[in-house]
Swiss-Prot record:
Location(s), subcellular: Secreted
Keywords, alphabetical: Disulfide bond, Glycoprotein, Hormone, Secreted, Signal
Subunit and partners: Heterodimer of a common alpha chain and a unique beta chain which confers biological specificity to thyrotropin, lutropin, follitropin and gonadotropin.
Disulfide cysteine pairs (residue numbers): C27-C75, C41-C90, C44-C128, C52-C106, C56-C108, C111-C118
Glycosylation sites: N31
Species in which this protein is naturally found: Osphranter rufus
Source lineage: Eukaryota, Metazoa, Chordata, Craniata, Vertebrata
Gene: LHB
GO BP term (any one): G protein-coupled receptor signaling pathway
Protein name in the entry: Lutropin subunit beta
UniProt cross-references to SMART domains, sorted A to Z: GHB
Gene3D superfamilies membership: Cystine-knot cytokines
Task performed by this protein: Promotes spermatogenesis and ovulation by stimulating the testes and ovaries to synthesize steroids.
Length: 138
């Protein structure tokens, strides 16, 4: 019984230090700079908004492939709102409005492609391919 409690305590202590580590921030709202552009508009706009980012616990089965794979959780929106910016200089007939999600709260869950990019971290952030303008959102 004593050994079981010791092992449990060590696991809890290790888990607590891992979770608090600055190298592995857990899933939470965080500020990020994004880029918005349209093929028809001459300017790319960069802006800062709140996204969900961070690590979620995951599990890999050790048993053979007889069991279905464990679902892998991603850091995704729990609650969100949508905001919009206007891309400047768009010609008549082109919709200049770019809408994007704003994280209000985050959680670890299945990826919802309707409002999340589930591709994982990128070597480079989304960059503008056109001249760009930085906007400050209120």
């Amino acid at each position: 019984r004593y050994q079981e409690l010791t092992v449990l305590l060590l696991l809890l202590l290790e888990g607590g230090s891992w979770g608090a580590s600055p190298l592995r921030p857990l899933c939470r709202p965080t500020n990020a700079t994004l880029a918005a552009e349209s093929d028809a508009c001459p300017v790319c706009v960069t802006f800062t908004t709140t996204i969900c980012a961070g690590y979620c616990p995951s599990m890999v089965r050790v048993l053979p492939a007889a069991l279905p794979p464990s679902p892998q959780l991603v850091c995704t929106y729990r609650e969100l709102s949508f905001s919009s910016i206007r891309l400047p200089g768009c010609p008549p007939g082109v919709d200049p409005i770019f809408s994007f999600p704003v994280a209000l709260s985050c959680s670890c869950g299945s990826c919802r492609l309707s409002h999340s990019d589930c591709g994982g971290p990128r070597a480079q952030p989304h960059l503008c391919t056109r001249p760009h303008l930085s906007l400050r959102l209120l």
